Amino acid sequence: MSIASQKKVKPSFVCLRCKQRKIKCDKLWPTCSKCKASSSICSYEVEPGRINKSPTIENAPHRDIRNITPASMSASGSFTSILNPSTKDWEMKNFAMNLSNAHDKLVVMNNTTIVDSPFAFHSILQHDLYAKALTTCIHERILIDVERHRENVSANNKKRELNLTIGDIGPLFFIDKAALKFIENTSKTSKLYPPIDFLYNTYDYEQAHPEENNDKISINILLEELSKYFLNKNEVDGLIVDFYKTIYPVYPLLEISLFEDNIRELLQLNEFNGYNIVFAGKDSRRKLETITLLTIILAFSYRRLSLSTSHSFKESFGVKSNNLTLLAHKLLALMNVFQYVNEHTLCCLLYFFILRYLNPDQADMYPTHSDILNLKFLENVAIKLGLNEEPFQYTRYVSESDDYPRLFNLRRKLWLGVQFLKFGILIPEGDSDILSLEYLRSFMKTDESLPELFERNYASTNNLDLSLMATAENIYHLHLSLQVLLTSCFPINGPSYLKEVLDNIDKTKDFLNQKFPLILSSLGEPRMKSLHINVPSSLANEESFDFSTFEENETFIANVISYTCTMNIYDSLSLHFENQCFKNALEYKTYYHRFTFTAIQDYLTLLKLISEYFNGSLLHLREPFGFATQKVVRFSIHRLLIFQATLLVRLFYKKDTCDRSSAAMGMLNDRNGRLSRVIEKMIKLMSYHMKLLVEIVISKLEKSYLGSFISVSIFRYIIYLVDTDALSAFISDYWKSDAVMDERYSRIHRIVGLKWGMGRDKSFSFTSKLNNPQFLGSLDLEILEELEKLISAQEFSRNFTEDVDESLQSEIDLMNYDNEALNQLMAIDLDKLLGIFPNLSNF
């Protein structure tokens, strides 16, 4: 552990942004004119006109979150006593740290080998000793139970039935239906989508002679299939307008007026009030791009309507969306998009990526490595197109193209779209790098703000886009701030430094609170006056768009992503100093307490946001924008559940340590009694929080989203272990069992060892560390009492009663359990099951 040396340099009174861009700064405080005009973060090394003082880091945990938690949350200010009495003169050191390592990010599963992102679920579970213990045991227990059952069936030649006592109840009883659903979906989607992603075969549409049906893949065949979706003009127009109002504001990647000009050339109204697709004539490639984009848009709208609880044609809409998605995929392949790279093909690729990513039939609750690889590839396409540069630098467009204003708007939107996707997908994963950061900065190096750039083309820009760009610029700067933060946490080469990380967190939260202050109605604050803007479409018949609700939705999503990110960082800092405390508790315990406390603060903020979104003052956001934003919300729910599970494992092991200590002394002293009581209360509170989230998933998400249905099954099993007081015993007993050393299960041990990096050869040292009272020694009475006060002060925690446990119990009846699903599961080939259960055991 080393302390960074700081060299004194002459202070600069120019703001950091102007200094970086090498432009003149008027040094106005607190925001210079240049930064104010571009809505950028303005910060100074030294406040102009004042004495240079080194910034101090307060001893109290991070200040209370503004405008977000109920009034009761402000009571947490009284809990800062955790650091005040004993550390009045304590000064935080700028430690060099390694918050992530390659070993914990390695994924070896089936035929896949990757190094994952720092905050990917697999990385988080590997990095945390107690999370790794739980997931390894669940994964291996599932596979061994399956193998044992097969052995019994083979030996006795009897019907496949599981006759287990309650004490033998394992995770199989909870995941059987999820596993069957996973298999069914895998079979269905493998038939629905060609397994080619964006690596298309080079197929040149223009050499295929579309007027002849002499090829297996013919544009005429696809157009004939598409024509049945254009029989009703009003329905088609309505679906396009629905897209403009629900998907486009969140992902504004196209130029509406340009798109509708192209549609008018492509679609011809017939005598039956339907559309004919006119593909004859010149510029057939542009028409192919237009029909592809239109097909994707219709698939979006049908998919969103299939999720609407108020519509009676949900199933048929889902089928139509799947069929249109498949047709769009074939059209993209026909376009040979990488041979003919342009703004319109990238627009199609981006919207197709979003359509597949948001598919509710996806089994994953989190971004897969293929999602991340595809997104990074799309960013490379955007860079190849030069979208990271302001379009006005390309002067040949201005002199040679009459329609350059709309093209410039489209180019800006496409770059923003790529970054917004990275904001929603990669930032929560902790994925960042210096090169991406520089490309982000290069786009904003102009003195003009985004609304000002769009106003240059005022005749070609509508009011909706001007309003969207003001919000988009704030999202862009927040994305930039989070990229800076993550890059400081996980440099490619070398350590991260504590003060730099904390300073970047403060800057990010300051910007978040300034630009995205979330005001919940539970605070008694009045909601903003509704603002409606006309949808800029000739198809909309002067329909208006509720821009105020959209702004609320963007504010909500910005807070969810930001607090997911900062919670992960504080949790990583807590884990880092927990390990350091094992070596030197006297030096590092204060740091461990601080970051454990702040991690819980951000956890509670995020939990409050999710709770309000499904059951409170943010409920009105779900209908218009739920489909476009559900992946971010579900990802955060999953991360909260993992946070709860790992804390519960720690509390159970701490409880075991406390019980052993009391038993050894033959009495329960006052301090041990207080410790036992606060641990019991914490277990009940965290278990209650987990049940609240599981109840949200079951009641609000499970029926519509396959990933939610699959993931919640494991957490129901964890709740069962908590309710039966068996969470730590489940882990400890497993490592003591004969199965761990049984050579019959060597294949299973090898699979699990590669998956989690913890094979049976390490079982003794691993269990010794889990049960070592020194390892959790810093999770002491002082911090536990402060955490219990903080958690109990929350409104949703105060609703907790002892009776709620029974009302939220899992619906499984273990005494009268139906073996039908398990029997179906056991009939499946073992190799197929080995490929499924790693995904299920990944929480």
Swiss-Prot record:
Principal subcellular localization: nucleus
PROSITE patterns: ZN2_CY6_FUNGAL_1, ZN2_CY6_FUNGAL_2
SMART domains referenced in this protein's UniProt entry, alphabetically: GAL4 (SM00066)
One cellular component (GO) term of this entry: nucleus
Pfam families linked: Zn_clus (PF00172)
Keyword terms: DNA-binding, Metal-binding, Nucleus, Transcription, Transcription regulation, Zinc
Signal peptide segment: none
The organism's place on the tree of life at top rank: Eukaryota
One GO-annotated biological process of the protein: positive regulation of transcription by RNA polymerase II
DNA-binding region per UniProt: 15-42
Cross-referenced CDD domains: fungal_TF_MHR, GAL4
GO MF term list: DNA-binding transcription factor activity, RNA polymerase II-specific; sequence-specific DNA binding; zinc ion binding
InterPro entries: OAF3, Zn2-C6_fun-type_DNA-bd_sf, Zn2Cys6_DnaBD
Classification via Gene3D superfamilies: Zn(2)-C6 fungal-type DNA-binding domain
Function per UniProt: Required for growth on non-fermentable carbon sources.
Extra remark beyond the main annotation: Present with 339 molecules/cell in log phase SD medium.
Protein name: Uncharacterized transcriptional regulatory protein YLL054C
Species annotation: Saccharomyces cerevisiae (strain ATCC 204508 / S288c)
UniProt lineage: Eukaryota, Fungi, Dikarya, Ascomycota, Saccharomycotina
